[in-house]
């Protein structure tokens, strides 16, 4: 029988099994509400395959006066409040005592169902937009393979060059914690770079002074439009092609910087080449025990296809068309997410 661990709660299935005897009351069924009680306090509906409750996983069984879907939408608000108040050492822990103290606004059942139905419809629209983005990403991947083949196996037998032969590969100059400010020039970490790679709006949380920024630029230069930046922990290939002239700086080591030096390469082609290399062969490129990280020396050695620039430019034109579609979908998705936040605030405070 599958055994539910905390990591399984959100995804709704388990790949861990037990042969021990169990009581029927510990069996979790489809759509049962579960909460992970360590780390991030997530609530989710369980998937189709029955499984067993495990330690640090809590099942919620609402009473007759509470609609299950209403409870599902209310609980993230309550859990977030508890999480914010919970002391952080290494991993946050949620206690049964704290759960039992949660006060749930008990509205008439019909009203509860109406609230849950409204939020469910918004969730369906959000999921649809996310599926559209995923399909557009698949379209790009298919087009790349069609034109150039898989970067790992090179079925078209392109000649290759090490990345360091066509680009400068490095990072930034170190900025110390005490040098960070509450305003000024935005300072991006891997988290923000990853979000920008996904074309999400980023609100900077950290800054450096303009004077400090100028000093850093004199020492290391600054990213230009068309340069590539990526988080050092990047198994999903989140690479940002710089698309702004606005000043910013970034964290050394945690963000890698690629600046093309060859006129025979297109930045868009290079982005998707590295994305393909990283996503299909991350284990052999990255290093580290806890979190495998991309290192500058390894990135320099990455092999890049030596293909005609005309072909690269054709691919870049295709990407431009797809990106316009993605931007439209992404804007719609962000509006839906804002709508859901507003509704959650209206319903649950």
Please provide the spans of the model-predicted regions.
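Sequence-specific dsDNA recognition surfaces
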Residues: 2-30, 164-179, 193-225
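Short amphipathic alpha-helical signal-transduction/dimerization elements
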Residues: 75-83, 274-282
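Short, solvent-exposed loop/turn positions at domain surfaces
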Residues: 21-22, 88, 127, 174, ...
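A short glycine-rich beta-alpha junction/loop motif
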Residues: 51-58, 75, 88-110, 248-256, ...
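Active-site/binding-pocket entry motifs
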Residues: 9-12, 41, 59, 193-196, ...
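ATP/adenylate-binding site constellation spanning eukaryotic-like Ser/Thr protein kinases
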Residues: 6, 96, 141, 160, ...
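Non-catalytic DNA-recognition/assembly elements of restriction-modification systems
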Residues: 9-11, 101-116, 128-173, 182-184, ...
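A short beta-sheet element
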Residues: 5, 24-76, 189, 211-213, ...
